[in-house]
Amino acid sequence: MGRKWANIVAKKTAKDGATSKVYAKFGVEIYVAAKQGEPDPELNTALKFVIDRAKQAQVPKHVIDKAIDKAKGNTDETFVEGRYEGFGPNGSMIIVDTLTSNVNRTAANVRAAYGKNGGNMGAAGSVSYLFDKKGVIVFKGDDADSIFELLLEADVDVDDVEAEDGSITVYTAPTDLHKAILALRESGISEFQVTELEMIPQSEVTLEGDDLAVFEKLVDALEADDDVQKVYHNVADV
């Protein structure tokens, strides 16, 4: 599983990096986190979390600094979170999380991306009840038992700890992700491949041939929208 999450980040970074969309999306997320609290990551846990994720995605320091500087200024641009759920081919399900300054524009764009690429946008809640929100942390290591005990001693609500191919993957309750990261840092672990809040499907489907091609095109179209921050789905190995 550790390799899976690290591969997802690597694929997304490689794909988004060609157009720098990942920089712009993290820029917005950093701006919002800094604007809603202190523009200092040492005083703002949410901001520090976003910056750590940005670094994992290889976002340059100047992009991070620019977003924080913007939040320190007189700019009063307002961003609103949104969620759009829908369906792709052959049992595939998708959740799209957005952060936008224009809800009407974003809703229209996401609906069009679904409709023009073999998908259908559903009602709120039509898909998300089949996913579980969890914190996911991935770092190098092989002793899952000691990590599990360490987190329990730190009073972290741990769902599971897995070790595979030299990586450890920790699943936590979403409210305890920050606490888990802090406990791991205090134990001497300083580098993480993944620290994310994820919507994890309760079961996965496997797509092949034309269905897989349609699904990948649909996900690409959704991720290409500047207002889309995260796309979750239930398709295995994508």
UniProtKB/Swiss-Prot annotation:
<dbReference type="Pfam" id="PF20772">
    <property type="entry name" value="TACO1_YebC_N"/>
</dbReference>
<protein>
    <recommendedName>
        <fullName>Probable transcriptional regulatory protein Sez_1681</fullName>
    </recommendedName>
</protein>
<keyword id="KW-0804">Transcription</keyword>
<dbReference type="InterPro" id="IPR049083">
    <property type="entry name" value="TACO1_YebC_N"/>
</dbReference>
<dbReference type="GO" id="GO:0003677">
    <property type="term" value="F:DNA binding"/>
</dbReference>
<dbReference type="InterPro" id="IPR026564">
    <property type="entry name" value="Transcrip_reg_TACO1-like_dom3"/>
</dbReference>
<dbReference type="InterPro" id="IPR026562">
    <property type="entry name" value="Transcrip_reg_TACO1_YeeN"/>
</dbReference>
<comment type="similarity">
    <text>Belongs to the TACO1 family. YeeN subfamily.</text>
</comment>
<keyword id="KW-0963">Cytoplasm</keyword>
<dbReference type="InterPro" id="IPR017856">
    <property type="entry name" value="Integrase-like_N"/>
</dbReference>
<dbReference type="InterPro" id="IPR002876">
    <property type="entry name" value="Transcrip_reg_TACO1-like"/>
</dbReference>
<dbReference type="InterPro" id="IPR029072">
    <property type="entry name" value="YebC-like"/>
</dbReference>
<dbReference type="GO" id="GO:0006355">
    <property type="term" value="P:regulation of DNA-templated transcription"/>
</dbReference>
<keyword id="KW-0238">DNA-binding</keyword>
<dbReference type="GO" id="GO:0005829">
    <property type="term" value="C:cytosol"/>
</dbReference>
<dbReference type="Pfam" id="PF01709">
    <property type="entry name" value="Transcrip_reg"/>
</dbReference>
<keyword id="KW-0805">Transcription regulation</keyword>
<dbReference type="InterPro" id="IPR048300">
    <property type="entry name" value="TACO1_YebC-like_2nd/3rd_dom"/>
</dbReference>
